């Protein structure tokens, strides 16, 4: 028997399929062409599985003074504008002057589409009450990511064990969905990377080294070498951690457009970074950041 002979039905089916491809080449091309990456993409935060926009809105420039100076109404408007541009990640902290405002700013937005990250500094006596306060202020059942704020010592995990345990309890209660730490020195950054407790890292990074982590166990606010931080980022990524870059525009000191362009292109070239966060005070700044990120990813 000749098994290579086609039946009339097979011939017609294959002819129809070939004709469909000829009639709709655009559809075939679209399916094979990867989508362009943008600032508004919903990316995955490490192994947490949580989704957030690639670009986040930071509400804590100079401890939130920059955003607070806008006034509540203009702050609300700016948050809504960012959301309309596809930014769904909003970053806050209990110590920011904008902390009492964020709940009103996001009121009415679909909670399931937002990623809210906040931070708690120091060692509150009742850390669960402090975490619950975030839920009340933000008018939400949960905070997507809660960080221990501004660590500077290598062995911070020892004196902060009580705080870490409370974060674990809050996660079990579903008050928070992920936990982590923001660091302001290389020793603290190494300690965070070495700790299996850490799920999310908020890391200062830009190619100029401005306000990046250095070896001093203090809040480093000078220019420091970039390479040691990049080494830590690679190790974090190897562990499946969620990694977010901050100080993208040098704590607001990159006044020249070429410096901002260089920094954003650098960040977008780093596969270790899931997302970045920038503090904004105007629609023009949001538009510029989105434009530069989109161009860098093109």
Predicted regions and their residues:
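N-terminal binding-site loop/beta-alpha segment at the start of enzyme catalytic domains
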Residues: 2-113, 166, 172, 266, ...
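Alpha-helical scaffolding within the catalytic cores
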Residues: 36-43, 99-100, 127-134, 186-187, ...
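Active-site groove signature of glycoside hydrolases
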Residues: 138-154
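Conserved, mostly hydrophobic/aromatic
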Residues: 45, 57, 90, 116, ...
